[in-house]
């Protein structure tokens, strides 16, 4: 259904009351992007192409695992797959390991049983690094004794084991009480909920990984455990001039990140609500609130936001998801997430293609439940004025798309900014971005509703040829959309462009007919 910004329904509740389970969404246009983690089961050009056909937009590499040779093979396979879909970009994301705390290695690398109520020691003394047992366990965070308070809880192995701090024995030793039965194993992750961790933003491994990403042309960084705006700047410093076009997406995974979110949002290019570690660092029911809060703030700022972790987790080993998982994906879309992410489902799962298809179908249905006109009016009302010229044009384009009942907004873009700002105001039609900037085309998959196309024909060499070049790009973009089934001949299209080439010149809006 298409409606104008001033027509009914005037509220979200009215729109929801008109939904019909018999309505089948179109299969050729999904606004939300899908991120898939590539693992051993999916690391081939053939498999990545199959995932793309199922709906994949962004390839994720998890640098907590795998060698540089392995990750290079993922990049090569992704680029080979991209070539099979001429003009349609595929983005590549590098997910950093980030600052993390781990236990040491147990004696003989065996598991040691512990019972609730058992009292033992945690030590930062390196002599216990490979001598852990049920009496003493090494922790590789030197400042843990200084930073943690008595009475605080320490989680080990994603919360499988929990301990309460009883006493600070000395500058490197804690006495703790085991709160549940379990096993002490080697090299398990440690979480300190409610404790400010002063680890450096980037380890030496992270710095090397970022430099690898720059050299191999990744499009975005998923930066783990971002706690302050300074963490984002530290990443940009490592990326340097050569990597200045790489988007930095800050993963919010602990209370510090939530507390400092406003300053992080100003500095970062986008955000990931990483619910796994976040659900350990803060009470699990509060993750629900954090997800809605962080997504809303990103929407208001016009910055892309990803919802991640366990979205279709049961599909790792089952052909169908639980109903709760489907609702989780759908509600993330309703919350305002630009992208949804698959982890183990595609990295190691038995049903990677089915997982992407299910994500695709769920997003399609969820997007029908959004009242776009009331949402646009709310976003426009909340916009701080005066706006920059490019944002004014974006607002006008989205407004015109409602009033003209347009089937698409087509954006001629250099940097992707105008497409991102159109996405901010959530039109109910696709945003077709035509650009010569391959990197901008790829990372524009982060923005909801944006369909990026890479235009390969050379730029006009003089101002006299500029308008002819504009008309050629508009016609080419519409032809590509017709070929994909997004547009039909005769459809109304809103077009925005610059008065000349280069960055920051977007100031022109037109209403066209697809011919």
Swiss-Prot record:
K(+) binds at residues 62, 64, 95-96. The keyword ATP-binding applies. One of its GO terms (cellular component) is cytoplasm. Its cofactor is Mg(2+); K(+). Pathway: Carbohydrate degradation; glycolysis; pyruvate from D-glyceraldehyde 3-phosphate: step 5/5. Substrate binds at residues 60, 276-277, 309. The record marks 251 as: Transition state stabilizer. It comes from the Eukaryota. GO terms for biological process: glycolytic process. Its EC number is 2.7.1.40. One of its GO terms (molecular function) is magnesium ion binding. PANTHER family: PYRUVATE KINASE. This is Pyruvate kinase.
């Amino acid at each position: 259904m298409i409606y104008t910004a001033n027509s009914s329904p005037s509220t979200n509740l009215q729109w929801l009351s008109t939904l019909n389970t018999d309505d089948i969404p179109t299969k050729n246009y999904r606004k939300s992007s899908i991120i898939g983690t590539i693992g051993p089961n999916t690391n081939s050009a053939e498999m990545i192409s199959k995932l793309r056909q199922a709906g994949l937009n962004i390839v994720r590499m998890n640098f907590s695992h795998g060698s540089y040779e392995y990750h290079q093979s993922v990049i090569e396979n992704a680029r080979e797959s991209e070539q099979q879909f001429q003009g349609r970009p595929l983005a590549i994301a590098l997910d950093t390991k980030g600052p993390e705390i781990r236990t040491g290695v147990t004696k003989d690398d065996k598991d040691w049983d512990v019972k609730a109520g058992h009292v033992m020691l945690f030590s930062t003394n390196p002599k216990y690094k490979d001598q852990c047992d049920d009496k003493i366990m090494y922790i590789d965070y030197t400042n843990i004794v200084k930073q943690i308070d008595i009475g605080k809880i320490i989680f080990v192995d994603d919360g499988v084991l929990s301990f309460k701090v009883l006493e600070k024995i000395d500058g490197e030793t804690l006495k703790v009480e085991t709160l549940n039965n379990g096993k002490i194993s080697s090299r398990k992750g440690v979480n300190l909920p409610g404790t400010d961790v002063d680890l450096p933003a980037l380890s030496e491994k992270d710095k090397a990984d970022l430099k690898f990403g720059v050299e191999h042309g990744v499009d975005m960084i998923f930066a783990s455990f971002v706690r302050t705006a300074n963490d984002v700047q530290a990443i940009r410093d490592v990326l340097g001039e050569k990597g200045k076009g790489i988007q930095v997406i800050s993963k919010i995974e602990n209370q510090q990140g939530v507390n400092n979110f406003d300053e992080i949002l100003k500095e970062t290019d986008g955000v990931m609500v990483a619910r796994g570690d976040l659900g350990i660092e803060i009470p699990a029911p509060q993750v629900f609130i954090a997800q809605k809060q962080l997504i809303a703030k990103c929407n208001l700022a016009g910055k892309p936001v990803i919802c991640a972790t366990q979205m279709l987790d049961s599909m790792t080993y089952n052909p169908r998801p639980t109903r709760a998982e489907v609702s989780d994906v759908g509600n993330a879309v309703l919350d305002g997430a630009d992208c949804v992410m698959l982890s183990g489902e595609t990295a190691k799962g038995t049903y990677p293609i089915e997982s992407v298809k299910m994500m695709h179908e769920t997003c399609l249905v969820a997007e029908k439940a959004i009242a776009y006109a009331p949402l646009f009016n709310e976003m426009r009302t909340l916009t701080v004025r005066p706006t920059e010229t490019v944002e004014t044009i974006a607002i006008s384009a989205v407004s015109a798309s409602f009033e003209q009942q347009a089937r698409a907004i087509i954006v001629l873009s250099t940097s992707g900014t105008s497409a991102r700002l159109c996405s901010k105001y959530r039109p109910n039609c696709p945003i077709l971005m035509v650009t010569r900037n391959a990197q901008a085309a790829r990372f524009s998959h982060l923005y909801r509703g944006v369909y990026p196309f890479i235009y390969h024909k050379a730029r006009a060499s003089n101002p006299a040829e500029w308008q002819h070049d504009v008309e050629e790009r508009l016609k080419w973009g519409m032809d590509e959309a017709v070929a994909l089934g997004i547009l039909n001949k005769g459809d109304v299209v809103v077009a925005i462009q610059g008065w000349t080439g280069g960055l920051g010149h977007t100031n022109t809006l037109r209403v066209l007919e697809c011919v």
